[in-house]
């Protein structure tokens, strides 16, 4: 009778693994230029909906969370503050920085949405949001230095997507924005962030 819980647990684990539907692959058919991505595609862990746009399977997603948690832990230890900025950003904040035309016409990097509510861009980066957020939050030089960071999806209109995940149109990125009193403080922030990733 005592063995039943163990048998039940083993059966549940087998069921979980079988439900992942991981495909069998022949390693001889792998593209040597992009072996990692090619293996993921053949396993079914990476699915291409269109050039530069991918969906990710269970193993990929779990691994991504593990890596994110390691990064978050190190950034938090370094005194950085986790935030979340909108992925849908109004044109007006990009007009304030005079970068709307740079990102939509000159470089043609940003995906845009124009409807009866107004004009918006899907975030290729978040300097505008970070600047406005910091200006509202940091009322005195005594609040400096401050480093805000987020981990989230970004969107860029890559014309020539290359090598699966090297230049996709959607991707997850950790971006950090620092507010410093002096250039020396800014350099110290850079060294701090460098050390975070060395850890």
Task: Name each model feature, range by range.
Residues 1-14:
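Short, Lys/Arg-enriched N-terminal segments with co-localized hydrophobic residues
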Residues 15-199:
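TRNA-recognition modules of translation machinery and tRNA-sensing kinases, especially anticodon-binding
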């Amino acid at each position: 009778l005592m063995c039943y819980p163990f048998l039940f647990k083993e059966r549940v684990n087998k069921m979980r693994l079988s439900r992942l539907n991981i495909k069998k692959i022949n390693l001889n058919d792998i593209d040597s230029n992009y072996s990692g991505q090619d293996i993921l595609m053949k396993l079914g862990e990476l699915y291409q909906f269109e050039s530069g746009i991918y969906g990710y399977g269970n193993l990929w997603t779990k691994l991504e969370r593990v890596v994110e948690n390691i990064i978050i832990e190190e950034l938090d230890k370094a005194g950085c503050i986790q935030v979340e900025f909108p992925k849908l950003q109004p044109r007006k904040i990009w007009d304030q920085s005079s970068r709307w035309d740079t990102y939509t016409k000159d470089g043609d990097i940003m995906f845009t949405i124009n409807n009866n509510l107004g004009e918006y861009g899907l975030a290729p980066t978040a300097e505008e949001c970070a600047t406005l957020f910091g200006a509202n939050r940091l009322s005195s030089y005594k609040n400096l230095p401050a480093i805000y960071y987020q981990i989230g999806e970004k969107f860029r209109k890559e014309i020539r997507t290359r090598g699966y995940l090297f230049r996709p149109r959607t991707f997850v990125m950790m971006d950090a924005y620092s507010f410093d009193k002096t250039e020396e403080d800014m350099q110290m922030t850079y060294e701090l962030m460098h050390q975070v990733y060395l850890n």
